[in-house]
Amino acid sequence: MMRSHYCGQLNETLEGQEITLCGWVHRRRDHGGVIFLDIRDRDGLAQVVFDPDRAESFAAADRVRSEYVVKITGKVRLRPAGAVNKNMASGGIEVLGYELEVLNESETPPFPLNEYSDVGEETRLRYRFLDLRRPEMAEKLRLRSRMTTSIRRFLDENGFLDVETPILTRATPEGARDYLVPSRTHAGSFFALPQSPQLFKQLLMVAGFDRYYQIAKCFRDEDLRADRQPEFTQIDIETSFLDEKEIMGLTEQMIRNLFKEVLDLEFGDFPHMTFEEAMRRYGSDKPDLRNPLELVDVADQLKDVDFKVFSGPANDPKCRIAALRVPGGASMPRKQIDDYTKFVGIYGAKGLAYIKVNERANGVDGLQSPIVKNIPLDNLNAILDRVGAVDGDIVFFGADKAKIVSEALGALRIKLGHDLNLLTCEWAPMWVVDFPMFEENDDGSFSALHHPFTAPKCSPAELEANPAGALSRAYDMVLNGTELGGGSIRIHRKEMQQAVFRLLGINEAEQEEKFGFLLDALKYGAPPHGGLAFGLDRLVMLMTGAQSIREVIAFPKTQSAADVMTQAPGVVDAKALRELHIRLRETPKAE
């Protein structure tokens, strides 16, 4: 081996020992004839001192520059008391350099790697191999590795088998667009890259493997956001002969173990909340419980008011009127309220009514709002009592279709929590359960809220008689308002699977064409089974405090699903296209 130690391994116990380091010159400093080099490797930093008394090594140190790759041999010694650097793991020692060999030189990097600089993300991604040298970026990937090691160890110890499933498969309707791969040997046919290993892991349960897991690559061709990538990684889990309570308990234990091992944080038992309660109180199926703000229904107090903006929705069973109290918000300037009004408009809200509670004892005169003149004082007081309003508060209102009100005020709740620093703790894990089986589309048809293979809490006959009211055996783990993972008990009987397909508008011919292999498998003694999948990238993002999952993936794509480093996707030559039986059509020019 070229080295004896990593930089991060050096400490006071090695005093007096001769060691050899290999790494990059992170920083070079010349202090009164003594040269200091900070050497960096994947494990950390170490300070090496070169003294003019050793002429050859001193001359070599004088020639090196930032990002040169070097091999250094020297002796570990304690730093003087006033020179200890508590910000470095090796800050109590330094290395007196004897020998320095330059293994490779470096051009000046396009951005500094040894200090913070506000570099555009595209530049960082273009030179990702340099960006990853920065200690804060390397630390994120080291933590990611520790996380997957912890997860694999836990699952191995609990009897799970790591089984790989196909990457080249066939397209199935799972919500997002598939990435398609043309087949050279089957002209006109295409493979699809998997959006998840869902059906294969269910087939492994039919095959009797009982407990499966995989750190799986998945692919979705969809519009990207801060927490989405076209290719992403799932911690994929499936079990047989366990019910939802047992699966949730096992995976909760895995996450608690992960946080303890990696961050030394201990969580208690995760609270459970139904989908209905989460939407009613927080306007979201993944509520952030660190935020104390809650939505409160007040339609019953507004049915008879002479104000159609409220009385209309209050008397419509498909609508909702909810109030959101913000403690101390009465001092909020009008511009800030206008900004929040524009914000809820993103979610379809037509406006944002409000009441500033200046002095409740003065009745209507103590309230500041354009709407109070339209609401009787008794009703106003009933609303303010219900939301717990006191002097100095502001109360926002949403009145519209139930979905719009929940989403708009739910998003406003999150924004207010961050803008006003209302969060009460650092971590708030939970489970959301009892999801609806389906969501109804505008045309009256149904879509699966999770996926078509989720088992309902009723019989096939009951499901088909009342699909809108059916609940599923699904469960989501949520942390700080982010869905960490979602899962369910699966359908293991053919007649139930066919009933769900029918309700989704998939006729028998299409069922056979797209899911014939699954329906066949369900005829041959499929066991009760269920599972869960965690988004690894999202989990790493939360545990490292990163702002985007692009920060925790070694080589991510941009928000336009491109790789600016390798220039992917790229043009394919005509010969390759002919072999794939593909002909490109020119895009018509705009007139």
Curated annotation (Swiss-Prot):
Site, as annotated: Important for tRNA non-discrimination: H31, G82
Entry-linked InterPro entries: Aa-tRNA-synt_II, aa-tRNA-synth_II, aa-tRNA-synth_II/BPL/LPL, Asp-tRNA-ligase_1, Asp-tRNA-ligase_1_N, Asp/Asn-tRNA-synth_IIb, AspRS_core, GAD-like_sf
Superkingdom field: Bacteria
Record GO terms (molecular function): aspartate-tRNA ligase activity; aspartate-tRNA(Asn) ligase activity; ATP binding; nucleic acid binding
Keyword list, A-Z: Aminoacyl-tRNA synthetase, ATP-binding, Cytoplasm, Ligase, Nucleotide-binding, Protein biosynthesis
Cellular component per GO, a single term: cytoplasm
Binding site for ATP: R220, D221, E222, Q229, E483, G535, L536, D537, R538
PROSITE patterns per record: AA_TRNA_LIGASE_II
Region called Aspartate, residue ranges: 198-201
CDD domains xrefs: AspRS_core, EcAspRS_like_N
One GO term (biological process): aspartyl-tRNA aminoacylation
Enzyme Commission code: 6.1.1.23
Reactions listed under catalytic activity: tRNA(Asx) + L-aspartate + ATP = L-aspartyl-tRNA(Asx) + AMP + diphosphate
NCBIfam families from the UniProt entry: aspS_bact, PRK00476.1
PANTHER family: ASPARTATE--TRNA LIGASE, MITOCHONDRIAL, ASPARTYL/LYSYL-TRNA SYNTHETASE
HAMAP family per record: Asp_tRNA_synth_type1
The protein's name: Aspartate--tRNA(Asp/Asn) ligase
Recorded name of the encoding gene: aspS
